Amino acid sequence: LGPLTYEAQRGMFVHPTYAVTPQREPLGILDVWMWAREKKDDSGRRGGPKESLRWIEGYERIAEMAADMSSTRRRYVAGREGDLMALMERADALGNPADWLVRAAYNRSLPEGDKLWEYATHDEAVGEIAFP
């Protein structure tokens, strides 16, 4: 077991990828990523793989299923801790077999030096989706 939110708490993290219908009916778990964090080193950093990789791997599982679900529209929703650029690049490399959405809570810096909100809202919106 490894540290959780606080170093004194011990346990494991679980990141499921699950499927639901447009009517919100659960279909089941497609993939599960489990890990225990390593302790922080003297500089306050943790070793091991970046935890944001779990979002990329979840998208890859959806992409693997795309051939068997050609008549189904697939959407992948990543949490705000997902690596936006890495997910965009991986989706593009796989041919975008599923729509994707990354929830974002912060105005992140982009590789070119721009900020996310300004970049994303620079052009006129091409559509809008409302979630009840």
Residue ranges and their predicted role:
Residues 1-132:
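Conserved, well-structured functional cores that handle cations and Mg-NTP chemistry
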